């Protein structure tokens, strides 16, 4: 996988993003502003896509950049969109994402948010706490789910520790078998997979 060079360059007496002069962008939109280069987005996405096996699906995490134009662009070329709130769910739907291609992950999901996405339609929900599981049980709406757990021996060299001990980001590994049994016992929950971070920020 290669990292794209910066699209910003000085050419023909002007600073440009790709072939678009910054002076023209400022004249049209004023400042301050954010400008995104679609060519760079595509280049980075395609580079990652080519580096991974075909069996791996790519999801764009809306929290990385919720700009509607960026989300719409990735909704068209990525396998799906990952959301972390009901607000991001609405961004995904407005971006044209198919409901089966929306994945709800992240700690702190409220019962109201879970009901909101279930009523609207969702591809998959990642369960990260007993409270979330209890809410899904009580709502009684069929949905694909995965269980997020923290491996007993996780790496600890980064800014965030996401393995090794219980945390808000999933179940302790010692509770995994029990949690799997609990999910499988609920008729309207379809266990689709497991979610884990083998290290930090990976």
Regions found by a protein language model. Name each.
Residues 3, 139, 151-202:
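Active-site loop/helix belt of alpha/beta enzymes
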Residues 1-124, 130-143, 166, 181, ...:
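A charged N-terminal "starter" segment
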Residues 61, 128, 144-150, 195-197:
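Short beta-strand segments
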């Amino acid at each position: 996988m290669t990292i794209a060079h910066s699209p910003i360059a000085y050419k023909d007496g002007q600073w440009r993003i790709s072939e678009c002069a910054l002076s023209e962008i400022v004249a049209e939109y004023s400042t301050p502003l954010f400008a995104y280069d679609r060519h760079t987005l595509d280049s980075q996405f395609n580079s990652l896509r080519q580096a991974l096996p075909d069996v791996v699906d790519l999801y764009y995490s809306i929290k990385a950049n919720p700009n509607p134009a960026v989300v719409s662009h990735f909704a068209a070329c990525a396998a799906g969109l990952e959301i972390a709130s009901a607000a991001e769910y609405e961004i995904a739907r407005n971006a044209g994402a198919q409901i089966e291609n929306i994945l709800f992950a992240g700690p702190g999901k409220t019962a109201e948010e879970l009901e909101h996405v279930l009523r609207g339609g969702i591809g998959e929900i990642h369960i990260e706490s007993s409270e979330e599981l209890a809410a899904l049980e009580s709502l009684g709406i069929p949905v694909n789910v995965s269980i997020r757990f923290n491996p007993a021996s996780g790496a600890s060299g980064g800014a965030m520790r996401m393995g090794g001990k219980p945390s808000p980001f999933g179940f302790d590994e010692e509770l995994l078998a029990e949690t799997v049994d609990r999910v499988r016992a609920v008729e309207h929950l379809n266990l689709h997979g497991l979610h884990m971070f083998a290290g930090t920020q990976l």
